Amino acid sequence: MVRNTIFGASFALLALSGAAVSQERVVNVFNWSDYIEPSILEDFTKETGIKVVYDVFDSNEILETKLLAGASGYDIVVPTASFMARQIQAGVFQKLDKSKLTIIGNTWDMVNERIAIYDPGNEYAIDYMWGTTGIGYNKKKVMERLGTDKIDSWSVVFDPASAAKLADCGIYMLDSPTDIIPAALNYLGLNPDSKSADDLAKAEELMLKIRPSIRKFHSSEYINGLANGDICLAVGFSGDMFIAQTRAAEAEQGVEIDYSVPNEGALMWFDVMAIPADAKNVAEAHEFINYMLRPEVAAKASDFVTYANGNKASQALMNKDITSNPSIYPDAATLAKLYTITPATPKEQRGFTRTWTTIVTGQ
């Protein structure tokens, strides 16, 4: 776990109206790396007097381990919805008190309906951001090695011959079996939501063929790797790729990054805000979620992280380059290519973990 100390220091802005230190209001947030506009937290503290203690993680597995162990110390966490389903069954979360979420009407029915697959009735979570898992790449480096600067197929990474051509300039993949294995299954023409041992074995066989060409499995380092021109391709989250694209453009070093939702399809996922069952600051957690539901706040968050959000009312306030980009807010043709995955049972999850360990270690 990475402690973002600047948040703990800068956003501890308290209304000191004679209140003792022991009475200070706090909300402890555990969110993904590079996943919020810092001034949002500062503004929340200025308005409410609630100190934000903000920690970050870079994989659902890290978050889940903490939650299942209990006594995490967090009041707000941001799991991916497909993970949240089994966490709800394990009693990890408490139901939201929607009477305290006074502007919940700003949420988007389309997103709520999809999240309800994992959280029936939308009782435990509110969407924060959503996006796709696809391919970000350095156009110049890919052109030099593959003879094209437009990627439209997963074959660029899953075909061993293609992957080998890119190995020297660097391929990164998410350290996430629930993102990469479904992509491999989908490429093989299998059900990306399959949990069967036979299908996992086929995905493992495919991944082991390209394993020598993969420089690293990591769920955040690829952002700067792409932006700095240190790697040529990454399989990762859509918004991260656009962050890399923006950073590369700002650096003015001739690095041009693009993002592709391949023709074969890609995973559509949802990151949600939820309150752990053992949260100590439940009122503050609801106040934080309600603040994040403000259209102007959701718009600022999306503009910063370049992800779509589940707040329909925010879209009119967002950067039009984001809302008009079909790789961020998919049009009908792009949506038709996207798939979602259903929750895995504990036994199925162990199968994923074993397969993933074999893939990452290469043996």
PLM feature spans:
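A ligand-binding cleft/hinge motif common to bilobed small-molecule-binding domains
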Residues: 83-86, 233-254
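Periplasmic-binding protein-like
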Residues: 200-209, 215, 253-274
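Conserved C-terminal helix/tail region of periplasmic/extracytoplasmic solute-binding proteins
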Residues: 224, 332-363
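Extracytoplasmic ligand-binding site segments that recognize negatively charged/polar headgroups
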Residues: 78-84, 88-213, 218-227
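Early extracytoplasmic/lumenal segment of secretory-pathway proteins
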Residues: 23-87
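Short beta-strand->loop
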Residues: 94-105, 155, 251-267, 276-278
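Mature extracytoplasmic/periplasmic domains
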Residues: 271, 276-337
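Paired acidic/hydrophobic, glycine-rich loop segments that form the ligand-binding mouth/hinge
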Residues: 74-79, 215-216, 232-237
